[in-house]
């Protein structure tokens, strides 16, 4: 079953809570969840959407980055996964504005994230995931020589295939969710 741990909210008037109080509460809750999971008492935790301004965005962009910092992950290999038994979705970039995504992706980042994802599936589900990687541009930038699909994404996929990852792509992001993709466990987008 689902175990719920209450983190007491000690505000006299919860409708007049200051930003500072809310921030302390959110960080306390996330830290408690992290500590419990780090002690192998639980396999993971679920969080609801959090106002990113409460995490001191100068240092931490979101929960994914908060957990990476707590786990001393400095190589940007952490993965945010939205998961259910039928399909998981993973963005390569997290908490980055759309106009910065193209400049934020690179071959090494894609490789790091997908190796982490693959290892996670092997550890948690005892199997190799079938991974679909999406392109960045509409229609995959028509796979033109200067597109991110040709310069960055495809070389990363080819390198991962050499490492024996079960991976396909880049597929067109425009239409990937129109039909049911039962042949994939995970769809990986650039954002």
Show which residues each predicted segment covers.
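Anion-binding alpha/beta catalytic cores of soluble intermediary-metabolism enzymes, centered on
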Residues: 1-191
């Amino acid at each position: 079953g689902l175990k719920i741990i209450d983190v007491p909210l000690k505000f006299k008037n919860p409708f007049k809570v200051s930003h500072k109080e809310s921030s302390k509460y959110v960080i306390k809750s996330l830290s408690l969840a992290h500590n419990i999971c780090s002690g192998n008492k639980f396999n993971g935790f679920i969080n609801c959407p959090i106002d990113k301004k409460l995490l001191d965005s100068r240092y931490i962009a979101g929960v994914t980055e908060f957990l990476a910092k707590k786990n001393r992950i400095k190589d940007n290999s952490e993965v945010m996964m939205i998961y259910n038994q039928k399909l998981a979705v993973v963005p390569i970039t997290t908490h980055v504005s759309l106009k910065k995504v193209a400049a934020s992706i690179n071959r090494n980042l894609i490789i790091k994230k997908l190796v982490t994802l693959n290892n996670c599936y092997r550890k948690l589900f005892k199997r190799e995931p079938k991974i679909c990687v999406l392109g960045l541009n509409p229609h995959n930038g028509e796979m033109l020589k200067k597109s991110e699909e040709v310069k960055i994404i495809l070389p990363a996929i080819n390198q991962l295939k050499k490492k024996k990852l079960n991976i396909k792509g880049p597929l067109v992001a425009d239409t990937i969710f129109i039909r049911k993709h039962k042949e994939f466990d995970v769809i990986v987008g650039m954002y």
